[in-house]
Amino acid sequence: MIDEALLKLLVCPKSKAPLKQVGNELICEVSGLAYPIEDGIPILLVEEARELDKGSDKK
C-alpha cells in the first residue's frame, strides 16, 4: 500500500491528473491508464502502464 501522503503528491505523467490506488496499481481516470506498483514502488512510466478497459468499472 502506498503511503497516503505520498499518494496525494503523485500525478499521472501523461495527464497530470491525480491517481488513486486500486490493488497493485495506480489508476488515472483522465488518461485511462493503470500504472503498476512493483515491490511497493510505483512505476510511473507511460510505456509501462496498461490501458484501462473503457466502461469496465462504470455502469
From Swiss-Prot:
> One GO CC annotation, please?
cytosol
Please, which domain of life does this record's source organism belong to? Bacteria
Cite a single Pfam family from the UniProt record.
Answer: Trm112p
The record, for InterPro entries, names: Trm112-like
Q: Which PANTHER family does its entry note? A: PROTEIN PREY, MITOCHONDRIAL, ZGC:162634
Family from the record: Belongs to the UPF0434 family.
Tell me what this protein is called.
Answer: UPF0434 protein COSY_0767
User: What organism does this protein naturally occur in?
Assistant: Vesicomyosocius okutanii subsp. Calyptogena okutanii (strain HA)
